[in-house]
Design a protein with these regions (language model features):
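A glycine- and small-residue-enriched flexible loop/hinge signal that marks low-structured segments
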Residues: 1-52, 57, 63-300, 307, ...
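C-terminal edge-of-domain segments
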Residues: 325-357
Length: 357
């Protein structure tokens, strides 16, 4: 897959090869220039990012911070100067199946007026709708106001809890929103904005998660936290946070959950992102629309086995192909599915995973 954008300088590639098997990050933020507005590019280094966006811009600084963590050019960027730029960009890039999308200029509680529905909507509701429409395996990582904006830790925590509480109240009042959230809440991660010297903690979290090592927990980062937050401070909330270790002088990511409605294994953000990685790697496009029979079933099984064997030991401990079947939805229509049993690292039991082919 190629991401093509208009070339205006000669120091960076006009066409970047996009490897969908990697955990790629898309940073959406504001530059100090109008260069490459709403265009998806990979700066391929800090010099090009500074040239494109301005060295002091929030987009360039976030890119540099992420690159220092991932140490590889898996970070794509978009210059979004207005709120409408975010909507236009998200609508046009989700089909690329980025692992993590980070809309830095948007907060979890931000809303916009949708002229199609004639009402105000949360951006994250619209993002979940698009993920459903495109059937992609992307995780949106959101944050909120920075901890330095608050007089005390209690006020900072109260603010974040209020945001989540109001969103959940809004969701449960609308049947359509509730149905969407019930199905796709795991596609959203909310992290507290509590790192010193970092404007957007969601960009840092995306970098931590993008390092492909499912055998261990995400690596700590070389940042201090503004407040010392503990597990008891975020009890029963769908909110990840960074915790500073005074011995190592680094910060870990704790309470790493997504915003899934149900309290089950799939609310674990590491499990969810591991499953999405499996789905991205399992390429069944050539079987879609095909007449289901014993031969097609065998081909799907062989394709899945080859892919899963290559992933075993890096993404998960073990797996089983439980079933491959066909679900009839109409007289001449239906879909093929594959059911897997996956044993993640850190677990003693298999978890059930079902993918529509």
């Amino acid at each position: 897959m190629n991401i093509i954008y208009e070339k205006r300088k000669n120091n960076y590639s006009a066409i970047d090869k996009f490897d969908s098997t990697k955990n790629n990050i898309l940073l959406l933020g504001k530059a100090d220039t109008h260069e490459e507005r709403r265009n998806v590019i990979n700066p391929n280094g800090t010099h090009n990012a500074a040239m494109l966006y301005g060295p002091n811009s929030e987009l360039c600084q976030a890119y540099n911070q992420c690159l220092s963590i991932t140490q590889e050019c898996n970070i794509f960027t978009v210059n979004c100067r207005t709120y409408s730029d975010y909507l236009d960009t998200i609508d046009s890039v989700l089909h690329y199946n980025f692992s993590y999308v980070v809309p830095m200029g948007l907060k979890l509680d931000d809303t916009f007026f949708n002229s199609y529905t004639n009402k105000y909507e949360y951006y994250i509701d619209y993002f979940m709708y698009l993920i459903e429409e495109y059937q992609c395996y992307t995780t949106i990582i959101m944050t909120s106001d920075h901890a330095s904006d608050f007089e005390s830790m209690d006020k900072f925590l109260d603010h974040n809890n209020k945001i989540l509480r109001e969103y959940f109240t809004h969701t449960t009042k609308d049947n359509d929103n509730y149905a969407l959230y019930s199905k796709n809440g795991s596609d959203i991660i909310f992290v507290m904005n509590n790192l010193q010297g970092v404007k957007y903690a969601n960009a840092i979290l995306a970098s931590q998660l993008s390092i492909e090592n499912y055998t261990s927990y995400p690596q700590d980062v070389d940042y201090k936290t503004y407040y010392d937050i503990y597990k008891t401070d975020v009890k029963n909330t769908s909110c990840a946070y960074h915790k500073f270790n005074h011995l190592t002088n680094k910060s870990s990511i704790d309470n790493l959950v997504n915003m899934r409605l149900y309290e089950d294994v799939y609310k674990n953000a590491l499990i969810d992102t591991m499953i999405k990685s499996i789905f991205r790697m399992l390429d069944f496009d050539k079987y879609r629309g095909r007449l289901y029979n014993a031969y097609i079933k065998l081909q799907i099984q062989n394709t899945a086995k080859t892919t899963l064997e290559n992933m075993k030991g890096q993404y998960f401990k073990n797996y089983e192909i439980k079933n491959i079947g066909f679900v009839k939805t109409a007289d001449a229509a239906g879909y093929i599915y594959i059911e897997l049993l996956i044993m993640p690292y850190g677990f003693m039991e298999y978890i059930n995973v079902v993918m529509e082919v």
